[in-house]
Amino acid sequence: MKHKKSDNFKTKSVSSSLVRFALDFEPEFASDELKEVAQLSLFDWFVVSIAGQSEPVSHIVRNQIKSEGGNEDCSVIGTTQRFPARAAALANGTISHALDYDDTHFAYLGHPSVAIMPAALALGEKTNVKPEKFWNAVILGLETVTRIGAWLGRDHHLSGYHSTATAGAFGATIVASKLLSLDEKATNYALGLVSSMASGVRAQFGTMAKPLHAGMAAANGVEAALFAQAGLISNPDALEAEHGFADTHTTQDRDTAIALNGLGEYWMLKEVLHKYHACCHGLHPTLEALLQVREKNNLIAKNIENVSIAVPPRYLKICHILSPNTGLEAKFSFRLSAAMVLNGQDTAALSTFSSNACKNPDLIALRNRVSVTPDTNLSETEASVQVQTTDGEILSAKYDINRSLPYKFRKEKIMNKAFALLGESSAFELWDLVATGDPMEFYKVNKIGLT
């Protein structure tokens, strides 16, 4: 049986169309590629969650939900204690975004997995779901958050809303509704309800509230679905009704086609981007281009005369700290991070971006030979580099992090990240656990790297 074409899902509204699609989409409809992306995304999510479990915000949220108690239904990263589904989603979402090292999607400038995976894992455990249904819900959640985020548009983000938290809540609601086997009416009520719950503002960036936004998105999705299951009635069109969520949270005209075109045929979730370097995502195209130059030419730092980097103009305001002094500042420095890569340092490791690196004389010497200029011809996911060697040779590369990567190469990059964060033994153990595909086994993750 083949799934229906996208036109058949276009009913009265974006929300009702996405609900109809989610209800009709069965596990057998998912391609191997979709399953691979979902599996890699869950693995990457677990990696950054385990690595972030000891961050201060992680301790605070875990301690808070411990103080509240409740049904012992669901696992939380960093403890063997179990919690109610909503609390588990809140904690796991926050923990997974604590390092800001999780995946992103440039279609809506948000982080998809930190909202989707915690909701899926919480209700997967609570309902003792079968693997096929779990992965089906994850795929639908990742697609929903991306399409709603893209439909809300850049204006939503630029107005000050945190798309990870807002669009993420709608994606988490679809996940939760699917795992609870809600019917069409109840799922629409759940989406309507979460329209009153989705929140998060960019003024919180740089504080502990930012990772909490991810936990809120996951928890709101779970709670909205549970309320709908209990019979709570909302306006099912509140996402796009007059005085509804979109009407009050964005000023631009919204094109329904962005949310619905190609639904079920063209999958936006395949364009999810995983972070392979422990720094601002705006640096990643540059670092990948420099890696290509270094590896292709067996380049060593002492043979470099100078480095020229061209980047999209907006990143000069975001990640162009000329002479960083702290590890955090190093994560926002084109020049220092370029020097790290060209010196052969592992930029996937959190420890690489340190105050000691900022004082390293070899890195400083090379950093001072790096220049960065804006190029309006580059997309926001591209960078181009030129390295001049001491014998006058010019080595060039251009890289777009939004390009499609083969599964094998993407897995290798994520695995190298896992090695850097968890160590090889723990990384392989985690991969084997995720590869079982059984969410009822995922609680064993707390035996990996538990502090």
Model-derived segments and spans:
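Well-ordered alpha-helical scaffold segments within catalytic/enzyme domains
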Residues: 52, 120-127, 173-179, 225-228, ...
